[in-house]
């Protein structure tokens, strides 16, 4: 069995420009993986996510954003239009990936893994809306999740990230 069997490091995904990215490149970084949507009422959290990234810039931490149209068809944009929206409106500098499905039988394999304890070995939590957040440790293991209404600027989120070291 692979060292990555219970790790997000086993997955390859595509950046918003179509470039393939191996999540093993984020080995030894704590991650916050978030499904985003530009037309969602939670979209202002993009600015909070960027602020969190800046606050933790000297630690081994990164945010990975995955646009999705799964909830309320709230991601009408595609490709670089999503990147442009995130940068122009919220100053986003963290990686934004290609639009994917995050729930159901058509969900991207990464999101199937994130949401299923049988696959990730830790917890079950399928996104119920946009801006569901998964906290991943440096070994690529799912360690916690936060519902959309939990702001990235919250003490709860910050403390959990800091505890990972």
Regions inferred by a protein language model and the residue ranges of each:
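Extracytoplasmic/secreted proteins, especially bacterial periplasmic and envelope-associated proteins
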Residues: 48-51, 81, 109, 156
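Conserved helix-turn-beta segment immediately C-terminal to the redox Cys motif
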Residues: 29-30, 39, 43-67, 87-90
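Short, internal strand/loop/helix patches
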Residues: 80-128
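N-terminal "domain-start" segment that seeds a small globular fold
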Residues: 1-24, 42-44, 108-109
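Thiol-based oxidoreductase modules, predominantly thioredoxin-like and allied folds used
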Residues: 60-77, 93-104
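Hydrophobic adenine-recognition pocket in adenosine-nucleotide-binding enzymes
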Residues: 36
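Thiol-/selenol-based redox modules, centered on thioredoxin-like
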Residues: 112, 116-165
């Amino acid at each position: 069995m692979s060292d990555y069997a219970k790790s997000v490091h086993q997955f390859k995904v595509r950046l918003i420009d179509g470039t393939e990215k191996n999540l093993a490149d984020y080995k030894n970084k704590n991650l916050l993986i978030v499904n985003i949507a530009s037309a969602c009422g939670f979209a202002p959290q993009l600015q909070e996510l960027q602020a969190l990234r800046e606050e933790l810039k000297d630690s081994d931490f990164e945010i990975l954003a995955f646009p999705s149209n799964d909830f309320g068809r709230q991601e009408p944009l595609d490709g670089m239009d999503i990147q442009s929206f995130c940068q122009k409106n919220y100053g986003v500098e963290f990686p934004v990936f290609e639009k994917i499905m995050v729930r159901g039988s058509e969900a991207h394999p990464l999101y199937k893994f994130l949401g299923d304890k049988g696959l990730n070995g830790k917890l079950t939590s399928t996104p119920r809306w946009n801006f569901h957040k998964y906290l991943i440790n440096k070994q690529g293991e799912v360690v916690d999740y936060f519902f959309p209404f939990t702001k990235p600027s919250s003490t709860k989120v910050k403390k959990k990230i800091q505890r990972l070291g």
